[in-house]
Amino acid sequence: MTRFMTRFGTMGAAALAVLLTSAVDATAQMPTATPEQRTAGTQVTEIRFATEELVVRRDETVTLEATLFDAEGNPVEGAIALIFARGGLSPSLSILSGPSIELTGQQPGSGSLIAAIMVPESDGSMFGLAGVRQLATLPVTVLDHPAASIELDDLSHTPYTGTSLQMSGTVMTDRGAKHTTASISWRSSDPSVAAVTGSGILTGLAAGTVTVSASTENGITADATISVVENPVRSISMTPGTASTRTGDVVEFDIVARDVEGRAVTDIALDLAVSGLEGNGGFVFDDGTFVAEETGAYRVLASTGPASAAAIVEVSARQGPVAVELVAHGPRADVATSDLWVFEGRDGEDYAYTGTHAQGGGQRMFVWRVTDPTNPVLVDSVVVDARVVNDVKVSDDASWAIITRENASTRRNGIVVLDLEDPAHPTVMAEMTDGLTGGIHNVWIMGDIVYAVNDGTNAMNIIDMSDPANPQHAGRWELRPGETNKSLHDVWAENGYAYLSYWDDGLVILDVGAGSHGGTPTEPQFVSSISYPQGNTHVAWRNRDYVFLGDEIGTADGMRGFIHVIDVSDVENPREVAKYDLPEAGAHNVWVEDDVLYIAYYQGGVRIVDVSGTLRGDLYRQGRELGFFRTRAAEGQGLQANSANAWGAQLFKGHLFVSDMTSGLWVVKHAQPRPITF
């Protein structure tokens, strides 16, 4: 067996931040190492894996051997190596304390294993992992199971001559699952009747019948019989909803195709196009909507066969971003800050509760009095056994709160319920660990029900809080029960639906009392789901008919990932219609209120975005950003000076409260009211 040697090199804080702030939150799963194990780790200079590349099939479990060596090439006994899986493998963190670990293929594609050695904590802390240094990588390829069949989709419109339609289908594996990487090639039996491109764009050329064949690289085929019909359209009329608009505002067209007798032809796919007469950033979509990223005059064209129509739309600029003013900073330079919740206590005072992450030890929830937002006052803290207190939520009546626990020294994680009779000095009312010992990453409170994200099972636990001092299990829901190739990160619920951020499985929508699919708060029913190639679905928040999904993607250049805008007006068929993509940073947690989206955007600080009206295209490029503030702490005012790492954002009584992982609590205020989109 070929052996592959990789020398360890020290990883910088920025690169380690990319690794450790991913949604698997590996810091929460860190083992406890003895002083002897950490001392042994100081001797390690090399790792030798028993392969040059790890290749594994989806759902297959393999054993990976690895040996640690010192500078003289001698094996090192007693040290602990941490193996982080980036892309396609489970578990996300393995502890190499023996000769091998077991890994399971999860998501087909390319990735890597990153190894770190545990050393004495006095040797330094690297972004949340005190006493961890010296990393190596091993390339990984996860293969899907062989393609076994193709399921062809119906065409969206009647295939008339002179029109083009997209053929589509799903490749299924020999295990009955959707193939994640296979592509389909297309061929027409008679290109004089209907031509089809290799990617499946079918164009009707003459009335008649053809067979369109779909095939995969391994020879799996499927056929569809297509009847092309003579195009009946002789005229088209189109009227824009408005002839003048702003960048980012969507214009809807009333487009009607008619036959020779003036009857509307409704089952035809018209060709839509846009050209810039004075601008170069206009887009027209299949549903007849238009939006522009740049100012200017645009000509929108609808055509089919010999018929066509056009309309001109004038586009002016939106008002640009305005100042976001710093109101106050509550610095924390001793421990990393996680999420926050701001509320009015039962004593009439306002409070912000902030959690803590592993760097600096975690173990605390801080209590800030923010009745005067210009002067946040740290009045108390709650100490629990947990290296990570990732989330904090407060009940609707502000009588109790929940904080989550991960990586407790006892391995008994779960949730802690706080009594808020005195919100300035909350006390522990109850703990719940049974069935939750793997750790709880996030929670959402809906009345007397708490939905909890279980790290150990990747399921959503349902907890009855009708008696907060005695929480009870009330149910559970998970995607693909019994399977391990999944990762649940967050849950948000409102108006009878729950929105689960299921990482590479995307957004999962459940009926938890809406009544549309027979679900109740304790017996959820599946409604629909939507995923996208990059995966890493980290957070979801619904506003009107849109769900805003945030990615969390670590790269060598820092955090990346953006906001996907999902149209759920038809809740059974969610579709992505827009995005907000800040190029130089990565999205984390979000808050939406009064059609304004607030995004804690890691190194991009907090971003404020107008999400009123109909949404299409790239909201960032359209100029919908209303303002931003970079949460950069001064020297001595945070764990890392002059470096934003925004974690969470919440609007409360006109002020925006932001938690920053490396600098604590910030209070800012936008200098103008929300603009109105007509």
Residue positions per predicted region:
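Bacterial N-terminal signal peptides
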Residues: G12-S22
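Sec/Tat signal peptide C-region and signal peptidase I cleavage site
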Residues: V24-T27
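Extracytoplasmic soluble-region selector
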Residues: Q29-P321
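Feature marking well-ordered beta-strand scaffolds used for ligand recognition
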Residues: S235, T239-T242, G282, E293-F678
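Bacterial N-terminal signal peptides that target proteins for export
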Residues: T2-A13
